[in-house]
Amino acid sequence: MKKNKLAVLTSCLVLSGTFCTQAQNKTPQEIRIPDTYKLTNKSIYRNGWIDFNKNGKKDVYEDPMVPIDARVEDLLSQMNVEEKTCQMVTLYGYKRVLKDDLPTSDWKKQLWKDGIGAIDEHLNGFQQWGLPPSDNPYVWPASRHAWALNEVQRFFIEETRLGIPTDFTNEGIRGVESYIATNFPTQLGLGHTWNRNLVHKVGYITGREGRLLGYTNVYAPILDVGRDQRWGRYEEVYGESPYLVAELGIEMAKGMQTDHQVAATSKHYIAYSNNKGGREGMARVDPQMSPREVEMIHVYPWKRVIKEAGILGVMSSYN
């Protein structure tokens, strides 16, 4: 049975790559990886540490043996207002907001010349919502995609003042949002299985594929509790039961973060799924509920997933 499942998965991945290549009307052999950015700071890479701020000495934040809190405090003490501001920003990737697939000399004049908190969905093969797949050559194979993200990372490490790496984020609603990643059922579909082990495996594959593609942070699991079927994103929830959402959310997060593959960032904190009238998108409004309802229904999954799965990120609600 396991061999059959593996064969099916392998076939799906092969077909996914075939469709991706055909959509771009190119074969991997015809795509040349351009040398758009050259390594200019080889001297910053030392034995066991990186001289991120290029000052020739090992600062506290550059020492991997120092406790993380001390490293954070040291880095914050060296950051100016512009650098701190940029670390609060997420930049949407290629064909969404960012016009370049790889770094260019113009990047040193842009907002992110001082670094950027995260780049979301970069080079994942999609453009704006409703548009056909983008034609970038770094979607397939996965090794080329990872190489491209590493090139982007090199810009932030080597060409910004403090060398703060960016966080490569992506959606994980039904697997990694990539043109070549495995496309799982929605969370609502998985919720109907009531199968903890299955959801754990979905989480593991999601984290594994995200890591192999070069992403460091995946937005999942979704811990919204569905109480109004009119809501336009109802398919993203595990169901209407806080207990079910908590149980499956725990397994999804544990699977994703196995062996530190990626950071699991859950969303949306809190009560995002209960807008008045089930409104969503540009018409979204605030939720209306009692404090008891918030605590008993919507806070419950978050308490458990944070404590029992140790998720590494939280996305706030924006209703």
Predicted regions located by residue number:
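Bacterial Sec-dependent N-terminal signal peptides
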Residues: 1-25
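Glycoside hydrolase catalytic-domain context in secreted enzymes
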Residues: 19-319
